[in-house]
């Protein structure tokens, strides 16, 4: 009997080893198709009504499989893929094959979407309130009263009451998923069989610094998107809070005082509420969810530094804007170092349009760090966070539309530029509409921040003159180096520039 077992075990192992090359060959053939289908499924996942942790995990899994699919095509030199056929070389080292994945427009946009799904995964899992006490356990899902119900509002106000940061994130993720699949699909097959790539690998791109530089820039851009979702959600919910305060002023009997506690609203599931059986949604459930009693000094798991249990909105914004600033700083420094020792420009900075596209968000993120360092979420902080992400989208439009000439532009297709320009106009109009509507309802104005503080004012309150100067400098840079070229193109005094591809046979001494 033992001899029979010893004979069957090697046979099973040999059979499994025999199946491994077949499985590898099948995956090599099907990886572009699987990556394409994963991208299609990601759009349907982003279209779901509720962005729960399971849905975000599935969204992150789909983009991870898609990214590893194109990565496997580059490593195995699968020249049946058009993206690999035009951007890779079979004789390149393994490290540069991997970095060649994001050296083109399609691969870099797939990396952008993968980082966006990863940040959404962290944001959804780590920003959830944990260790909620039993007395306020259901405060996030229960109603406040029948008068605060969203069913009693009109259609426009009812739609606004359902908007939160996860819904805004879902809209951004949905756009980039559609944009990637419609105009920048990296899994396009070619109809003929080939064993050699179309283009040789550029010697300038064979640098370890350049392999790390683009992911750092993309990580900084996407981190600003999470801060944008938080700020826009805060602006929208501030209008709901003002409406709730009006109801409390006119209906004080709805306030249920408790001994030794803050007054709480008499919810529909409490004994004092006459509408305990009415299943209506709440208009102010998000504001009550922020006052949920939580245990202090608790974390969700090892990455609890991202959002602890007692973290407020301004702390989340501070963390994400610091993440954006750190990645942009590292990316700009690495790009300057690469330009200095590889391109031989004679300096660390050339004021290239692509360099300006990453420098403008860095300036705004620096101003936002000065504004968010104090535990006070004012209107100026919200405005700076929103403009930082809008500036990232604007810089991406300039780099990927082919409108401006640069040493390292990605694309010249006008269709991609139209997608990004429409998205930029849409989110800019929505953001400014809600922001200025909030400013009209607020008692303070942005211009009043320039006034000299009186002696009775709290000295810890920061004066945003420094932030305004940073923003003015950023606007000057944008006008001087970006929109000046656009004006010449519109006047017809300057023809459409072609993308400059720098090819060098050897490194400069």
Curated annotation (Swiss-Prot):
An example Gene Ontology CC term for this record: mitochondrion
Compartment(s) of residence: Mitochondrion
Keyword field: Cytochrome c-type biogenesis, Mitochondrion
Pfam family, one: Cytochrom_C_asm
Main location: mitochondrion
Gene Ontology molecular function: heme binding; heme transmembrane transporter activity
Biological process, per Gene Ontology: cytochrome complex assembly
Family: Belongs to the CcmF/CycK/Ccl1/NrfE/CcsA family.
Purpose of the protein: Could be involved in assembly and maturation of cytochromes c. May play a role in guidance of apocytochromes and heme groups for the covalent linkage introduced by the cytochrome-c-heme lyase.
PANTHER family in UniProt: CYTOCHROME C ASSEMBLY PROTEIN-RELATED, CYTOCHROME C-TYPE BIOGENESIS PROTEIN CCMF
Name of the protein this chain belongs to: Probable cytochrome c biosynthesis protein
């Amino acid at each position: 009997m033992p001899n029979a077992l010893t004979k069957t075990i090697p046979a099973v192992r040999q059979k499994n080893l025999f199946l491994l090359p077949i499985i590898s060959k099948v995956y090599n053939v099907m990886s572009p198709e699987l990556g394409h289908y994963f991208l299609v499924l990601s759009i349907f996942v982003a279209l779901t009504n509720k962005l729960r942790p399971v849905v975000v995990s599935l969204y992150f899994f789909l983009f991870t499989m898609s990214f590893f699919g194109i990565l496997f095509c580059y490593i195995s030199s699968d020249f049946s893929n058009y993206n690999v056929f035009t951007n890779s070389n079979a004789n390149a080292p393994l490290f540069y094959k991997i970095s060649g994945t994001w050296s083109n427009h399609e691969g870099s946009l797939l990396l952008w979407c993968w980082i966006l799904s990863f940040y959404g995964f962290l944001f959804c899992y780590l920003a959830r309130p944990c260790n909620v006490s039993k007395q306020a356990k259901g405060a996030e899902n229960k109603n406040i009263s029948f008068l605060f119900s969203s069913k009693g509002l009109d259609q426009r106000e009812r739609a606004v009451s359902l908007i939160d940061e996860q819904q805004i994130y879902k809209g951004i993720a949905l756009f980039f998923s559609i944009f990637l699949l419609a105009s920048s699909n990296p899994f396009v097959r070619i109809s003929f069989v080939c064993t050699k790539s179309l283009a040789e690998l550029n010697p300038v791109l064979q640098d370890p610094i350049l392999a790390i530089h683009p992911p750092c820039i993309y990580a900084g851009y996407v981190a600003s998107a999470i801060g944008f979702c938080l700020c826009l959600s805060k602006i929208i919910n501030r209008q709901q809070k003002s409406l709730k305060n009006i109801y409390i002023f006119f209906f004080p009997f709805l306030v249920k005082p408790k001994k030794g506690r803050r007054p709480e609203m008499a919810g529909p599931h409490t004994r004092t509420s006459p509408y305990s059986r009415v299943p209506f949604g709440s208009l102010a459930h998000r504001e009550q969810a922020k006052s949920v009693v939580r245990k202090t000094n608790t974390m969700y798991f090892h990455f609890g530094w991202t959002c602890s249990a007692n973290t407020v909105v301004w702390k989340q914004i501070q963390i994400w804007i610091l993440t954006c600033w750190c990645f942009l700083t590292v990316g700009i420094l690495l790009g300057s170092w690469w330009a200095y020792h590889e391109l031989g420009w004679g300096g660390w900075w050339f004021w290239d349009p692509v360099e300006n596209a990453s420098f403008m968000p860095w300036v705004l993120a620096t101003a936002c760090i000065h504004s968010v360092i104090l535990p006070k979420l004012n209107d100026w902080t919200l405005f700076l966070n929103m403009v930082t992400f809008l500036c990232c989208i604007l810089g991406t439009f300039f780099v990927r539309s082919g409108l401006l000439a640069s040493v390292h532009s990605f694309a010249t297709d006008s269709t991609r530029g139209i997608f990004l320009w429409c998205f930029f106009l849409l989110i800019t109009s929505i953001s400014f509409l809600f922001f200025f509507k909030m400013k009209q309802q607020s008692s303070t104005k942005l211009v009043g921040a320039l006034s000299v503080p009186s002696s009775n004012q709290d000295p810890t309150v920061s004066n945003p003159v420094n932030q305004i100067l940073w923003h003015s400098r950023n606007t000057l840079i944008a006008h001087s180096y970006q929109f000046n070229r656009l004006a010449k193109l519109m006047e017809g005094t300057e023809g459409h520039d072609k993308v400059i591809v720098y090819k060098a046979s050897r490194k400069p001494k």
